[in-house]
């Protein structure tokens, strides 16, 4: 007696190689349910192979360093350079050698619904995580570029394990550790992508807390960016202590002198 469709689906779920003999056998089965199951599983395997290839590509910079006997590599990224309110947040993450986390990417390319699950896996697997935070007052004092560098150095300094090399998204730090500046690094390096997720979730949670203190500004949804609702609240209620006075339109509103 032949297999039921349920049994075939169970067998297909275990297959990871498109050249497996079972695929050829089941292709001869004319039942619509079997053909649908075949098509679905093949699509899943192709997606899994594509994801594996993408994650392998994201280890390119790390593998180059592994080849030089460098193991402790910290990826560094920032979130929050553009908003009108709130801090700039950075993270430094050291992942174990050849670490692959499904779905890991630049936080801007990862659906928000998946941020916390990926963060949990990063926290579970990472050898060390450091977070740096610089508030609006300091941003106004030194400018956002310098504030970001300060926050990045904070993040590295808070790592419980000292890194041998830094992979940084589009920055160079005045710091006594060898480093590589990578343009669009959050989409090209697993270590930087991990830092991107950590920084993003950390900052989003901070902005939700600020939303409780300043409910008029919709910070829980706009994260401090200049949305229509945020700008309307600025006009109606003025600025808060977490607004950046060196950013327009706030700069003009308060006549801030940089």
From Swiss-Prot:
* GO (cellular component) term, any one: cytoplasm
Keywords of this entry: Cytoplasm, Endonuclease, Hydrolase, Manganese, Metal-binding, Nuclease
Q: Does the keyword Magnesium apply?
A: no
Residue ranges constituting the RNase H type-2 domain according to the UniProt record: 71-258
Which positions does UniProt annotate for a divalent metal cation binding? 77-78, 169
Q: Does the keyword Cytoplasm apply?
A: yes
Query: Top enzyme class of this protein?
Result: hydrolase
Tell me one GO molecular function of this protein. RNA binding
Q: Write down the Pfam families for this protein, in alphabetical order.
A: RNase_HII
User: What InterPro entries does this protein's entry cite?
Assistant: RNase_HII, RNase_HII/HIII, RNase_HII/HIII_dom, RNaseH-like_sf, RNaseH_sf
Which one GO biological process term can you cite for this protein? Answer: mismatch repair
> Which superkingdom, per the lineage?
Bacteria
Q: Which cofactor does it need?
A: Mn(2+); Mg(2+)
Comment on bound cofactor: Manganese or magnesium. Binds 1 divalent metal ion per monomer in the absence of substrate. May bind a second metal ion after substrate binding.
Give the location in the cell.
Cytoplasm
- What Gene3D superfamilies does UniProt report for this protein, alphabetically? Ribonuclease H-like superfamily/Ribonuclease H
Q: What is its EC number?
A: 3.1.26.4
Catalysis: reaction(s): Endonucleolytic cleavage to 5'-phosphomonoester
Per the record, the similarity remark reads: Belongs to the RNase HII family.
Q: What does the function comment of this entry state?
A: Endonuclease that specifically degrades the RNA of RNA-DNA hybrids.
Matching entries from HAMAP family are given as: RNase_HII_B
Name of protein: Ribonuclease HII
Origin organism is: Lactococcus lactis subsp. lactis (strain IL1403) (Streptococcus lactis)
């Amino acid at each position: 007696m032949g297999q039921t469709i349920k049994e075939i689906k169970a067998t297909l779920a275990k297959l990871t190689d498109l050249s497996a003999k079972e695929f050829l056998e089941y292709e001869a089965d004319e039942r619509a349910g079997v053909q649908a199951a075949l098509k679905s599983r093949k699509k899943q395997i192709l997606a899994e192979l594509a994801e594996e290839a993408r994650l392998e590509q994201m280890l390119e910079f790390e593998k180059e360093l592994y080849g030089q006997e460098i193991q402790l590599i910290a990826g560094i990224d920032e979130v929050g350079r553009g908003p009108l309110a709130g801090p700039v947040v950075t993270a430094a993450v050291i992942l174990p050698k050849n670490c692959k986390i499904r779905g890991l990417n630049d936080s801007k390319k990862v659906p928000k619904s998946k941020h916390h699950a990926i963060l949990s896996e990063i926290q579970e697997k990472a050898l060390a995580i450091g977070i740096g935070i610089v508030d609006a007052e300091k941003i106004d004092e030194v400018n956002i570029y310098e504030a970001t560098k300060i926050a990045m150095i904070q993040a590295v300094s808070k790592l419980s394990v000292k890194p041998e090399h830094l992979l940084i998204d589009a920055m160079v730090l005045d710091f006594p550790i060898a480093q590589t500046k990578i343009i669009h690094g959050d989409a090209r390096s697993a270590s930087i992508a991990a830092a991107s997720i950590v920084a993003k979730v950390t900052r989003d949670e901070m902005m939700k807390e600020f939303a409780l203190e300043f409910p008029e500004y919709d910070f829980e949804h706009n994260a401090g960016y200049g949305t229509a609702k945020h700008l309307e609240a600025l006009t109606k209620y003025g600025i808060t202590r977490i607004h950046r006075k060196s950013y327009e339109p706030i700069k003009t509103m308060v006549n801030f002198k940089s």
